[in-house]
């Protein structure tokens, strides 16, 4: 019983260290700002605008690594159409353990999705030590 409790504390502490801040204004050298975008890469509002203004997102590029940011398209349909882009991101994160990815509430702003719709797409990322998720995503994933 003690081991189980000890394990739960370790998992809890690990997750607390991997919660994305709600207001990111600067990044460390190895940190990547992960934001919801549109396929056309028109980074006009929300986290996409922050990525463009502060973290090197490229106007006209809607997907993937751009400077110190990573775009996941969320404006082109439902959750089923977003899933492949999240899967692609998770593979990228697995291949780049030297980077730490700060996932914002992708799709939960201008795109209009709820946390409980988007969070399950990131379930595989829970096991990656180099991916931080919003607290609201953790709550959905642990429910």
Per-segment meaning from a language model:
Residues 2-143:
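Macrodomain-like recognition of ADP-ribose-binding/processing modules
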């Amino acid at each position: 019983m003690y081991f189980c409790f000890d394990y739960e504390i370790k998992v809890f502490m690990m997750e607390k260290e991997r919660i994305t801040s709600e207001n990111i204004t600067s990044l460390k050298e190895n940190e990547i700002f992960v934001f919801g975008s549109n396929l056309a890469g028109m980074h006009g509002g929300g986290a996409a605008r922050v990525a463009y203004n502060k973290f090197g997102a490229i106007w006209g590029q809607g997907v993937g690594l751009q400077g110190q940011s990573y775009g996941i398209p969320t404006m082109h349909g439902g959750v089923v159409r977003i899933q492949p882009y999240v899967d692609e991101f998770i593979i990228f994160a697995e291949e780049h353990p030297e980077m730490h990815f700060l996932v914002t509430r992708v799709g939960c702003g201008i795109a209009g999705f709820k946390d409980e719709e988007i969070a399950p797409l990131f379930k595989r990322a829970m096991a990656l030590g180099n991916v931080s998720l919003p607290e609201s995503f953790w709550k959905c994933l642990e429910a």
